[in-house]
């Protein structure tokens, strides 16, 4: 019989999987022509996994890694969207953008042995 899992070890493994998923998501976005502006931006009340730009579009990206793409999509709930919106407002307050900039909230879903699925305009900022 195996001993119960160590909570800290489990947390470290989950964190590592999240970092790997974010790196894979960033690679997928860069191959689509996006340029990274920030990774793991944190402000009081929220965090954004990736902030990327392509042309006039600035995308605030939530990355979710789960066993299936469907499970990843379900993982972005209203509370997570609100936290991301607060962080996006904090980032925007610190950066000057052109008047014609297009802002949106995207999602990238990552599942084992699947290419990341990018959903532009996944939810309101």
From Swiss-Prot:
Query: Per its record, what are the GO molecular function terms?
Result: nucleic acid binding
Q: Which InterPro entries match?
A: Restrct_endonuc-II-like, tRNA_endonuc-like_dom_sf, UPF0102_YraN-like
Top-level lineage group: Bacteria
Q: Which family does it belong to?
A: Belongs to the UPF0102 family.
Query: Which PANTHER family does this chain map to?
Result: UPF0102 PROTEIN YRAN
Q: What is this protein called?
A: UPF0102 protein Mpop_0474
Source organism (scientific name) = Methylorubrum populi (strain ATCC BAA-705 / NCIMB 13946 / BJ001) (Methylobacterium populi)
């Amino acid at each position: 019989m195996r001993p119960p899992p160590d909570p800290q070890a489990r947390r470290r493994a989950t964190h590592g999987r999240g970092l790997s998923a974010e790196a894979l998501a960033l690679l997928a976005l860069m191959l689509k022509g996006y340029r990274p502006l920030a990774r793991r931006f944190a402000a009081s009340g929220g965090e954004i996994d990736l902030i990327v730009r392509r042309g006039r579009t600035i995308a605030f990206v939530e990355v979710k890694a789960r066993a299936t793409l469907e499970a990843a999509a379900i993982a972005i709930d209203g509370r997570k969207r609100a936290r991301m919106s607060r962080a996006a407002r904090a980032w925007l307050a610190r950066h000057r953008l052109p008047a014609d900039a297009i802002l949106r909230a995207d999602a990238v879903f990552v599942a084992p042995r699947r290419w990341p699925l990018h959903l532009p305009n996944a939810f309101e900022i």
